[in-house]
């Protein structure tokens, strides 16, 4: 089983507009609302692509109830820890080929709730082969909270795919609790290292050799339309993807995380792991709704992905 962790989930609201007009009224016809947060996007893609998945994290208030009811109508096993605060909304405005996001901060987690979740999570880990940990930390949790989750998983021999940024990611990278895989982009690498990181292959090689990333088995750097650059152990790969019509790119990174977790769970080869992860990312980009894949086109896209050692 794959366990997904979303500590700061949301209801994701998508507003497609031909043009975003500032300081006036914008009317939206086609609004979509989904149980969201990066980890729940991962969750949906996992079950839609055929994996058994349990979702956990914090939920509270009426918005939390909406998320739980959405998940209960799917093949997902919801196993959330209830809190006193209200789960958040996150809004994505899709306009003129751009994506503008408005993200609520979310609830503040009490010390008692934080400790209670660690016990809850420890029990779930014992039933899991792989865990994904995604997104921001809610207010009230220390930057080393993900480190604690990774250590608990490591103690049980469970692989961890971590997808976060900023101080929580830096704290993990500087700790002894190493995830199995991370999926940074250029912007996140630049933030971590305090210098601009381009998409140049030789530069990326040097960056991923830095001591900050030691002990991490898989590093997959997403390069958008340029595919991905990856490091597994001491081996580097460049992944090339076909040009595709993009409908909604929101959630494609989360879909890639789902692919990495699924491939680790089924012990795929390096090339197959990368192809599976990138295929799910592309399939998501072809859907209107966030964090969804239509597996009908899987083989067609998968066959067009090139993976080469560099």
UniProtKB/Swiss-Prot annotation:
GO terms for biological process: D-tagatose 6-phosphate catabolic process; lactose catabolic process via tagatose-6-phosphate. SUPFAM superfamilies: Ribokinase-like (SSF53613). GO terms for cellular component: cytosol. GO terms for molecular function: ATP binding; phosphofructokinase activity; tagatose-6-phosphate kinase activity. Induction: By lactose. The operon consists of lacABCDFEGX. Keywords: ATP-binding, Kinase, Lactose metabolism, Nucleotide-binding, Plasmid, Transferase. It catalyses: D-tagatofuranose 6-phosphate + ATP = D-tagatofuranose 1,6-bisphosphate + ADP + H(+). Its EC number is 2.7.1.144. Pathway: Carbohydrate metabolism; D-tagatose 6-phosphate degradation; D-glyceraldehyde 3-phosphate and glycerone phosphate from D-tagatose 6-phosphate: step 1/2. PROSITE patterns: PFKB_KINASES_1, PFKB_KINASES_2. InterPro entries: Carboh/pur_kinase_PfkB_CS, LacC, PfkB_dom, Ribokinase-like, Tagatose/fructose_Pkinase. PANTHER family: 1-PHOSPHOFRUCTOKINASE (PTHR46566:SF5), 1-PHOSPHOFRUCTOKINASE-RELATED (PTHR46566). This gene was sequenced from pMG820, a laboratory-derived deletion of the naturally occurring plasmid pLP712. Belongs to the carbohydrate kinase PfkB family. LacC subfamily. This is Tagatose-6-phosphate kinase. It comes from Lactococcus lactis subsp. lactis (Streptococcus lactis). The gene is lacC.
């Amino acid at each position: 089983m794959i366990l997904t962790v979303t500590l700061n989930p949301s209801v994701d609201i998508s507003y497609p507009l031909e043009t975003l007009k500032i300081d006036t009224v914008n009317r939206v016809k086609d609004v979509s609302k989904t149980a969201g947060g990066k980890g729940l996007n991962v969750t949906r893609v996992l079950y839609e692509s055929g994996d058994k998945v349990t979702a956990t994290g914090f939920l509270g208030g009426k918005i939390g109830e909406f998320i739980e009811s959405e998940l209960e109508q799917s093949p997902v096993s919801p196993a959330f820890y209830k809190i006193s605060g209200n789960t958040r909304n996150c809004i994505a405005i899709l306009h003129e080929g751009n994506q503008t996001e408005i993200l609520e901060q979310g609830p503040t987690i009490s010390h008692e709730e934080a400790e209670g979740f660690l016990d809850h999570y420890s029990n779930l880990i014992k039933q899991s082969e792989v865990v994904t940990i995604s997104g921001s930390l809610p207010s009230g949790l220390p930057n080393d909270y993900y480190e604690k989750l990774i250590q608990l998983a490591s103690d049980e021999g469970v692989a961890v795919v971590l997808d976060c940024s900023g101080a929580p990611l830096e704290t993990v990278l500087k700790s002894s609790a190493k995830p199995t895989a991370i999926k940074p982009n250029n912007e996140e690498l630049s933030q971590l290292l305090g210098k601009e990181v381009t998409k140049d292959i030789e530069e990326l090689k040097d960056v991923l050799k830095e001591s900050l990333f030691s002990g991490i088995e898989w590093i997959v750097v997403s390069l958008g339309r340029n595919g991905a650059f990856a490091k597994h152990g001491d081996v580097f790969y460049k992944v090339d993807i076909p040009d595709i019509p993009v409908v909604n790119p929101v959630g494609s990174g989360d879909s890639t995380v789902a692919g990495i977790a699924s491939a680790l769970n089924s012990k795929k080869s390096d090339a197959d792991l990368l192809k599976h992860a990138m295929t799910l990312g592309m399939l998501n980009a072809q859907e209107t709704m966030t964090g969804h894949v239509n597996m009908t086109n899987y083989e067609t896209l998968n066959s067009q992905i090139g993976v080469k050692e560099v």
